[in-house]
Amino acid sequence: MSPPINRARRIYKPRNVLLGAHKTTVRLEPVLWEALGDIARHRGITRQDLMREIDNDREHGVGLTSAIRVYIVKFYRDRIGDL
């Protein structure tokens, strides 16, 4: 069973992101920022580079924040396989 989620950790943390020449703000929960950083380190790239990849690969009409969340879930699901 998963540990309980601390309410304070669910507060969105905004960060400015530079995607090419475009600057935007992404708001994620701290645990998702941590996961994104962990994934980037695992892949040997910066979090900024990972967000650029996610931005470039997302479908038209899908928000960047949603695309990041989906990427994180897919990354971890691929690693745990069938439950």
Set out the residue ranges of the language-model regions.
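Amphipathic, hydrophobic secondary-structure cores in small proteins
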Residues: 18-72
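A detector of short terminal or domain-flanking linear segments
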Residues: 1-20
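Short, solvent-exposed charged binding patches
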Residues: 73-83
